[in-house]
Amino acid sequence: MSEALQINKPTPSIAGEKTIRFDSKSDVRETIYAMKAGASVLIAEFYSNGMLLLKELHKHLSNRLPNKTFAEQRAYRAEYHKLSNQVLLEITAHQVEVHKAPKIGWIEKLYPDTPDFLLTFPQVQGLNSAWQWYKNGVSVPVLRNKIHPYYGTYFPTRFDHLILFDNWL
């Protein structure tokens, strides 16, 4: 029984009916309120503009939502997840379209037939982290060499159990 492999990759996004542009001249507060009203936000100029918007979104939600109990923390995380996934980055010719954006090799490898599309900012952050782990490798104490995990592959970040297993062997 041979089934076609399905590649685990972020699904390209579609801009909402109302999409606003966010650059260094944009008002952060107005942008956050537009996002709460359902607008998508396309990051322009610099990658750091997206980082700034997500940081300010965290601050805004921290001031507006209680974050003490488990239920409140879940509500906070759900709201942050919903709003942060309305922040979009344009991918053109397999590159993030803003200045000073990281070069992410996974974009070309995972989307060979789709050179131009949109991804949410958190998806791009995830692809960037995964690319760095793949490119630089991850040291696992019980192995002689680094591992280079592909996007979407689980690898342990705590190694206590692996060290115990190695000692047992």
Model-derived segments and spans:
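Generic local-structure boundary detector
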Residues: 52-53, 95-99, 151, 158-160, ...
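Short, aliphatic-rich beta-strand segments
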Residues: 145-151
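Conserved alpha-helix/loop element of class I SAM-dependent methyltransferases that forms part
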Residues: 134-137, 144, 155-169
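N-terminal auxiliary segments of SAM/dcSAM-dependent transferases
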Residues: 1-143
